[in-house]
Amino acid sequence: MDDKDIDKELRQKLNFSYCEETEIEGQKKVEESREASSQTPEKGEVQDSEAKGTPPWTPLSNVHELDTSSEKDKESPDQILRTPVSHPLKCPETPAQPDSRSKLLPSDSPSTPKTMLSRLVISPTGKLPSRGPKHLKLTPAPLKDEMTSLALVNINPFTPESYKKLFLQSGGKRKIRGDLEEAGPEEGKGGLPAKRCVLRETNMASRYEKEFLEVEKIGVGEFGTVYKCIKRLDGCVYAIKRSMKTFTELSNENSALHEVYAHAVLGHHPHVVRYYSSWAEDDHMIIQNEYCNGGSLQAAISENTKSGNHFEEPKLKDILLQISLGLNYIHNSSMVHLDIKPSNIFICHKMQSESSGVIEEVENEADWFLSANVMYKIGDLGHATSINKPKVEEGDSRFLANEILQEDYRHLPKADIFALGLTIAVAAGAESLPTNGAAWHHIRKGNFPDVPQELSESFSSLLKNMIQPDAEQRPSAAALARNTVLRPSLGKTEELQQQLNLEKFKTATLERELREAQQAQSPQGYTHHGDTGVSGTHTGSRSTKRLVGGKSARSSSFTSGEREPLH
């Protein structure tokens, strides 16, 4: 048996794929192969003769798999038999492979003989194997590898199902992660964790210290600590939130990503604190959000309490309206906040330099807030959940609706309306709300807390309607956003629009009556002209035409039955 037959037999038994061993070794082999293919025939023959004189060297891990003769084993040097056993390439994009397959992979250690690798990559003719579809069929990717690769991608629970199927399908063959989890335990053996998140820390040095300059601590909450930071690259100020608990201390890793999921799906809205980025660092979750220079509404209320002041009714209406717009956006995204309270509402003051003194023309009435000097935004989405598939985690009990406590989730958006009503009560100067007891239940019966100011009857009635016991009867966020109590100008606009429509209807009616009267009083003396002149009269016609030259038509008028001469 010659060397070519031996090579063919080895290739059949080893069943090696023609892809590169590793990224570094693969690049080297491709370069060597290209040099070999570009050589002259004489040099190629010399190289082949040298290769024939050297038997194929096989790593130890593969020698045991092959039932080769003792003569071939003797031809391999001892140092070749001591080649370390190869392992599959481990990188973030490649899940761990089963042990049975790893035995068939060639060694990727530096001591692997180059002649063996060159024989595996270079064909006997000295040409590189094709990288087209035919070559790719030699190493088909099993379904298990495709499923395990999905373990490296988190599936956002707030993403609509239609979008999940859209971006996770590949020619109708790929399943979404949720389907794989329900496929059975035998598919889970390939490395797909059942319901475990992918929390992979950055490989760089501290990204927080590298990209941001910490200015001061601006808040401490249930999730963690918030810092005011300046990004070194763009010089802008951001709010960086660092989780208080580590991933190992959390009972469920999903809770660490819950707020990230909600922010990512919501996108950008003027009345929701903007989300920019997030990453894992030092076993903690870090979220980069928009910085609100006015602090929280709770901080403003505390300052008012110290000075004996409170927000007046016009300001209360402004807060209620802007937060209603933010809630309407959240609810339209099939989500609920479930933790609306003063400490989760943030204030942004428009800088004086941004005001040009020119009155801005608002093209869309929904964009009126763009010219506002003070913006109120909803933040802290740690308790947000889906309306269709709710996983409710109770927020602050002082602002909690009774139906949530009773686990009645039929009208989840109305729970946000209830909490918003009590938030306005606190901003109006109400005393601290009870956390439980008889006073807590007294409010849940529809009794609005006492406030140290006289509110208008219409506004007071609206606030009481927001906290009534029947959740279904509470106004929606969309209804609040278009309520004439909060937006009197909107009511005036609608009234003017109705008047305009009425006047248009009257005008159309008069025009129709005028046309009918003109048709009834039309003159009877019009004549009809043919090619030869006046041929008679045409009753009911309002105009006549005279053909000039048999082709062009010109209008003509008559005085006392005589035709007017042409000029």
Curated annotation (Swiss-Prot):
Catalytic activity: L-tyrosyl-[protein] + ATP = O-phospho-L-tyrosyl-[protein] + ADP + H(+)
Binding of Mg(2+), residues: N344, D380
The protein's role, per its UniProt record: Oocyte-specific protein tyrosine kinase that phosphorylates and inhibits CDK1/CDC2 and acts as a key regulator of meiosis during both prophase I and metaphase II. Required to maintain meiotic arrest in oocytes during the germinal vesicle (GV) stage, a long period of quiescence at dictyate prophase I, by phosphorylating CDK1 at 'Tyr-15', leading to inhibit CDK1 activity and prevent meiotic reentry. Also required for metaphase II exit during egg activation by phosphorylating CDK1 at 'Tyr-15', to ensure exit from meiosis in oocytes and promote pronuclear formation.
Tissue expr: Expressed in oocytes (at protein level). May also be expressed in testis.
SUPFAM superfamilies xrefs: Protein kinase-like (PK-like)
Name listed for the protein in its UniProt record: Wee1-like protein kinase 2
This protein's encoding gene: WEE2
Example GO BP: regulation of fertilization
Residues spanned by motif Nuclear localization signal: 173-175
Presence of the UniProt keyword Ribonucleoprotein in the record: no
Originating organism: Homo sapiens
Chain positions of motif Nuclear export signal: 315-329
Superkingdom of this protein's organism: Eukaryota
Coiled-coil ranges per UniProt: 494-519
